[in-house]
Curated annotation (Swiss-Prot):
Dual-specificity methyltransferase that catalyzes the formation of 5-methyluridine at position 54 (m5U54) in all tRNAs, and that of position 341 (m5U341) in tmRNA (transfer-mRNA). Its EC number is 2.1.1.-, 2.1.1.35. This is tRNA/tmRNA (uracil-C(5))-methyltransferase. GO terms for cellular component: cytosol. The active site is at 324 (nucleophile), 358 (proton acceptor). InterPro entries: MeTrfase_TrmA_AS, MeTrfase_TrmA_CS, SAM-dependent_MTases_sf, TrmA_MeTrfase, U5_MeTrfase_fam. The keyword tRNA processing applies.
Length: 366
């Protein structure tokens, strides 16, 4: 695979290999046959980052080969959305002959949505000021004249210049209902929007008919908690990153959801609060004991759950676990399978043509 060519004819084979690999990894836990969710074979990534290489009068996007570290020129990137590909060409054309925008530009980051909004962040090794802003506004207006709903941001050391805003609002059709998700520049969002919809719908299916409340750790911008709110009496969710919490609060209002409460704290701190080991000012006015959480949802970082959180989640009758690293999932299952059994297993091909797998498990108390 090269950045400008996807081996789409090999898609089925690479997905089949992942299915076999996941089944093998899950054999010790008596997991059922995985439900498999395919990705679009191209234009599936909604965000991408590129270094900018200056070559005489020319400049272009590059990425670095992960093995050799050699640079690879990238004029098109079929893994990314069609809007990113369109913007890649227009940004180079708009910057190439503009000294103010070109000088010491070293990276461009793209964030797009299925609702056809875009943020383009331009990163510099120089101070940015009014001259940069004026030229960037001209470029933005030229892009908008081509019916592109785009926002430009300039970044340098300790500097961030927003021409308009630093967010886009994604709209996703989830099980017959449109969900609005605010996505903030430089914050985590699911890279594969089509796969995100399938993950949300699978999580809804796995929690259908649930009793009681839902607890979610690592909720981000509320991606899962808001979609799952329709299956529970109430949802209590934790997140540590301030921009993500702010986005989650916006998303709660935008989707007219009244049964989700977001708390800004780490999963480890929440464990201490639930166990009565520590009191937190952030929890004033929230009666944790009033929640009857029968289900816990976790979507941890690649490192998986720490040992304290493992113990905590074992106290819940149902555990829904989305993993971006099946190896750490299996490590966690060595503990969780002592008390719970794997009811459902799903493979989400979030990153086609790579070794990476995203998967989900529903665990129920034995």
């Amino acid at each position: 695979m090269t950045p400008e060519h996807l081996p789409t004819e090999q898609y089925d084979a690479q997905l089949a290999e992942k299915v076999v690999r996941l089944q093998s990894m899950m054999t010790p836990f008596a997991a059922p046959v995985p439900e498999v969710f395919r990705s679009p074979v191209s234009h599936y990534r909604m965000r991408a980052e590129f270094r900018i290489w200056h070559d005489g009068d020319d400049l272009y996007h590059i990425i670095f080969d992960q093995q050799t570290k050699s640079r690879i020129r990238v004029n098109s990137f079929p893994a990314a959305s069609e809007l990113i590909n369109q913007l890649m060409t227009l940004m180079i054309e708009g910057v190439r002959n503009n000294p103010q925008l070109r000088h010491k530009l070293f990276q461009i980051d793209y964030l797009t949505t299925q609702s056809n909004q875009a943020i383009v962040s331009m990163l510099y090794h120089k101070k940015l000021g009014d001259e940069w802003r004026k030229e960037a506004e001209v470029l933005r207006d030229a892009l908008r004249a081509q019916n592109i709903n785009v926002h430009l941001i300039g970044r340098a050391t300790k500097t961030k210049i927003m021409l308009d805003q630093d967010y886009v609002d994604e709209r996703l059709p989830v099980a017959g209902k449109e969900m609005i998700y605010r996505q903030v520049e430089n914050s985590f969002t699911q890279p594969n929007a089509a796969m995100n919809v399938q993950m949300l719908e699978w999580a809804l299916s796995a929690t259908e008919g649930s009793k009681g409340d839902l607890l979610e750790l690592y909720c981000g911008n509320g991606n899962f908690s808001l979609a799952l709110a329709r299956n529970f009496e109430r949802v209590l969710a934790t997140e540590i990153a301030k921009p993500s919490v702010a986005s989650a609060q916006y998303n709660i209002a935008a989707n007219h959801i009244d049964n989700v409460q977001i708390i800004r704290m780490a999963a480890e701190e929440f464990t201490q609060a639930m166990n009565g080991e520590r009191e937190f000012n952030r929890l004033q006015g929230i009666d944790l004991k009033s929640y009857q959480c029968e289900t816990i949802f976790v979507d941890p970082p690649r490192s998986g759950l720490d040992s304290e959180t493992e113990k905590m989640v074992q106290a819940y009758p149902r555990i829904l676990y989305i993993s971006c690293n099946p190896e750490t999932l299996c490590k966690n299952l060595e503990t969780l399978s002592q008390t719970h059994k794997v009811e459902r297993l799903a493979l989400f091909d979030q990153f086609p043509y790579t070794h990476h797998m995203e998967c989900g498990v529903l665990l129920t108390l034995k």
